[in-house]
């Protein structure tokens, strides 16, 4: 039975690596996957899902105006699709999460979404909010804070490594711009304790 999955975490937990491994597992068994990533995240090249360990795969892009159900349904006219995988799923809109649920419910294709749960201000991203609400299965991918505890928050840093507390929710960056930390160190670094 097809399901909508949401694999969420803070940064540097291996979301893209896990997505790429899942896609590989399907393809190794001669099953087709459709891989999507957000058009606004071009850190490793446009139309690529790339992990920090150096593996990558070409991907279709989704933008705010992309109708994922229509696009996937159109792709089915060319070839069978066994699984849809979405990287950077926090950037999905509410409507796109709904469209992906239709892919599961109407087209009977499993959809695996990978993304951040919250931003640097500990607020849910729109895509994450609706995936947490509507996914059939939720799984947290874990990473650790510099103290060794489970990291479940992310700090945004400036060029000097100082914590930024305000700004736009979306700013594309990697290890140089963000640091995954535990709740205690998030509150401490943000001046909340």
Swiss-Prot record:
Cellular localisation: Cytoplasm
EC number of this enzyme: 2.7.1.21
PROSITE patterns cross-referenced by the UniProt entry: TK_CELLULAR_TYPE
GO cellular component: cytosol
Keywords tagged on the record: ATP-binding, Cytoplasm, DNA synthesis, Kinase, Metal-binding, Nucleotide-binding, Transferase, Zinc
Gene3D superfamilies, A to Z: 3.30.60.20, P-loop containing nucleotide triphosphate hydrolases
Catalytic activity as recorded in UniProt: thymidine + ATP = dTMP + ADP + H(+)
GO biological process, one term: DNA biosynthetic process
Chain residues that bind Zn(2+): 145, 147, 182, 185
Pfam families: TK
Highest rank taxon of the organism: Bacteria
Record-annotated active site: 88
InterPro entries in the record: P-loop_NTPase, Thymidine_kinase, Thymidine_kinase_CS
Enzyme class: transferase
Entry binding sites for ATP: 9-16, 87-90
Subunit organization: Homotetramer.
Family listed: Belongs to the thymidine kinase family.
Name of this protein: Thymidine kinase
